[in-house]
């Protein structure tokens, strides 16, 4: 009896750009052999707005409000890197108090970034409840930002060349300490719900494995790199702002899979709390209300009126000219290394302003770790990378 010969043809499927699990306007052209992924081609650019060219046609002071729109989950990080570049090029020194305020804002943003990653990632793999919990914690960070900057999520416009826009309001540091005390047990709550949940672990363990050498060769950074066994954190490596004053540990794992990336981000939130507590205690001058009272007693020529106790150095004029020269500066955001290459020509606008987005680099490895995976695992692997298409496309 003749037997029927069966043969399957590869099938091409489009994921996105309008798909509820795509984390933005990302399109994946996926080639499938049954349930297995044979190839994947990311199509980007749907959210391109020419941010680098905008930067080259604006003064640096004018460009700061733009950058938080690139990554709405990491607005403070982009504000920091955009002011750090001309500061280093022009050798502008930042007061110690301003540096501490910056570090506090950056660590709050790191926690907010990881929370906004955690909720949708868990929803992608089928755990809906924690998605609603994360907004409870983010709301408290929004309140702290609103009290200090006037804005809650994006367009904080708080960082300035030479420092920050204004000092912390009265009672703000105490509220920040209260948040740290309140948020610590919430991380424990997440871990009880998620970390050792057998369904969650079976769903993501062993998915999207990235080796140590592979992570380095693909220029990955942030949790993607540290989850692959490379304990590399720019806060330790580059010694920027005042991070050398704090005691904290680099969060890293060896497995390189989706579960390792989850563990790294959970531990990073704990380390951020440790940094926040130390910064609130060690900030030069202490709480604003105490600092102002002591200045009144000492007078204008007292020690607490010195440079390191100010929230900003000499305020930069709107006509501030970027000196001749070029440099690349970088910092560690919640997603990894973000950097700016700036080239000045003694003009109010930079001649070249190149932005390196962490999630843009991290996304490049997606086709390679998807090959051989099941179609149902695509969203889990993509979600573990943590991409925001505004900064990928710029």
Swiss-Prot record:
Going by the entry's taxonomy, the superkingdom of the source organism is recorded as: Bacteria
Span-the-membrane segments of this chain are: none
**Gene Ontology terms: biological process:** photosynthesis, light reaction
- By its UniProt entry, which NCBIfam families does this protein fall under? PRK06075.1 (NF004739), PRK07415.1 (NF005649)
What this protein catalyses is: a plastoquinone + NADH + (n+1) H(+)(in) = a plastoquinol + NAD(+) + n H(+)(out); a plastoquinone + NADPH + (n+1) H(+)(in) = a plastoquinol + NADP(+) + n H(+)(out)
Q: Where in the cell is it found?
A: Cellular thylakoid membrane
Organism of derivation:
Prochlorococcus marinus (strain NATL1A)
* Primary location: membrane
List GO terms (cellular component aspect): plasma membrane-derived thylakoid membrane
How does the annotation summarize its subunit structure? Answer: NDH-1 can be composed of about 15 different subunits; different subcomplexes with different compositions have been identified which probably have different functions.
**Name of the protein described by the UniProt record:** NAD(P)H-quinone oxidoreductase subunit H
Stated EC number for the protein is 7.1.1.-
